[in-house]
């Protein structure tokens, strides 16, 4: 029985490695395709969502209320440190909704959103015109910034697609000032968690907090379902829409998080003083 379980685990790990490599190669094409299909559509969030029990109930403007559950994931991640008046970098900013919300609400001195998708960055520049907020095209594994340039680095639901997560962590530490914060949330399948934890432990950063948030993300996805399905309807080719709704990545992620075969976590790290 133990050998059988080990073989199943090995099979799943190999399958995950193959799937993630395909996803990593495809992500630039997929995100560019989505951005171009959406054109001037007002889809500014690409994350699953987050809701606590009892509900968070953070006050939002009427325009932000439409994206409440996606915003709440950003709010909870950023609220792990005081970023008011600080220089903040978000790696993997997507369509800039989180960057816009945090720049307006948490009042950093500057907020820089970086993403690999050049079409997405162009979308962000057109859509989000806020003092102190800028968007830069670049690679998470080769950040185009000087050493010790930021007081906080934020990364939301993005790092699972980086080919070299360890290199990304090294870059985060490089661009952070001593005493700066790495505010981080993402998910991994259970058989990839040991490697995830090793990379985080080996990074030149000190962990301040960690918690599993499967319940909150699943709850957010359930409440955000109409918005997620609406995006699929607008982006996916007509012949594939029903299949994607039933079997696509969002549906698969929901089932894996609900069944705890994937774990979603939220972290806060600090760069030690020199």
UniProtKB/Swiss-Prot annotation:
GO terms for molecular function: fatty acid O-methyltransferase activity. GO terms for biological process: methylation. Disruption phenotype: Cells are unable to methylate the glycopeptidolipid fatty acids. Its EC number is 2.1.1.15. It catalyses: a fatty acid + S-adenosyl-L-methionine = a fatty acid methyl ester + S-adenosyl-L-homocysteine. The keyword Oxidoreductase does not apply. Keywords: Methyltransferase, Transferase. SUPFAM superfamilies: S-adenosyl-L-methionine-dependent methyltransferases (SSF53335). Pfam families: Methyltransf_11 (PF08241). The keyword Methyltransferase applies. O-methyltransferase that modifies the hydroxy group of the fatty acids. Oleate is the most effective fatty acid acceptor. PANTHER family: GERANYL DIPHOSPHATE 2-C-METHYLTRANSFERASE, ZGC:194242. Belongs to the methyltransferase superfamily. This is Fatty-acid O-methyltransferase. It comes from Mycolicibacterium smegmatis (strain ATCC 700084 / mc(2)155).
């Amino acid at each position: 029985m133990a050998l059988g379980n080990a073989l199943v685990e090995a099979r799943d790990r190999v399958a995950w490695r193959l799937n993630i490599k395909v996803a990593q190669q495809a992500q630039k094409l997929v995100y560019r395709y989505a951005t171009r299909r959406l054109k001037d559509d007002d889809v500014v969030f690409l994350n699953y969502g987050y809701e606590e029990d009892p509900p968070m109930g953070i006050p939002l403007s009427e325009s932000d209320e439409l994206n409440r559950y996606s915003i709440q994931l950003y709010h909870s991640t950023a609220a792990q440190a005081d970023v008011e008046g600080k220089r903040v970098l978000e790696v993997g900013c997507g369509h800039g909704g989180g960057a816009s919300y945090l720049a307006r609400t948490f009042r950093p001195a500057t907020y820089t959103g970086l993403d690999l998708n050049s079409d997405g960055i162009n979308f962000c520049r057109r859509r989000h015109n806020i003092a102190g907020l800028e968007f830069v095209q670049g690679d998470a594994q080769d950040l185009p910034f000087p050493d010790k340039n930021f007081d906080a680095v934020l990364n939301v639901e993005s790092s699972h697609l980086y080919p070299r997560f360890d290199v990304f962590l090294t870059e985060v530490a490089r661009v952070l000032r001593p005493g700066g914060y790495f505010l981080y949330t993402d998910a991994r399948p259970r058989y990839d968690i040991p490697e995830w934890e090793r990379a985080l432990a080996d990074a030149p950063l000190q962990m301040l907090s960690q918690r599993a948030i499967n319940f909150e993300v699943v709850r957010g996805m359930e409440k955000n379902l109409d918005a997620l399905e609406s995006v699929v309807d607008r982006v996916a080719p007509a012949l594939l829409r029903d299949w994607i709704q039933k079997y696509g990545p969002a549906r698969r992620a929901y089932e894996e998080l609900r069944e705890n075969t994937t774990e979603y976590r939220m972290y806060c790290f600090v760069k030690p003083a020199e």
